[in-house]
């Protein structure tokens, strides 16, 4: 089991650079994918249940900022089906800490 996030962008990111940056977040797992039907580029982020806690939450906050600010991704919480924003981040904190 894991807590999952879907990240989407319409601009193809530099996957090599992104992968290098994400490697240091060892509490999270990620993998890229292409949504061929609507020409969006996607990234899945997971917090495995074995990693749930304050450290994983802090890492997710850093990754969320990295993805939204530097790579122009929109991040969605797959459990609730909502975009991760300033309000919803409080819900995520309760779920993964």
Question: How would you name each of these model-derived features?
Answer:
Residues 1-97:
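Acidic (Asp/Glu-rich) sequence patches and key acidic residues
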């Amino acid at each position: 089991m894991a807590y999952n996030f879907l990240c989407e962008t319409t601009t193809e990111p530099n996957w090599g650079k992104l992968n290098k940056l994400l490697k240091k977040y060892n509490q999270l797992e990620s993998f890229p994918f292409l949504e061929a039907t609507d020409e969006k580029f996607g990234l899945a982020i997971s917090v495995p249940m074995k990693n749930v806690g304050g450290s994983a939450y802090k890492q997710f906050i850093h990754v969320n900022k990295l993805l939204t600010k530097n790579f122009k991704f929109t991040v969605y919480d797959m459990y609730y089906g909502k975009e991760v924003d300033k309000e919803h981040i409080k819900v995520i904190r309760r779920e993964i800490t």
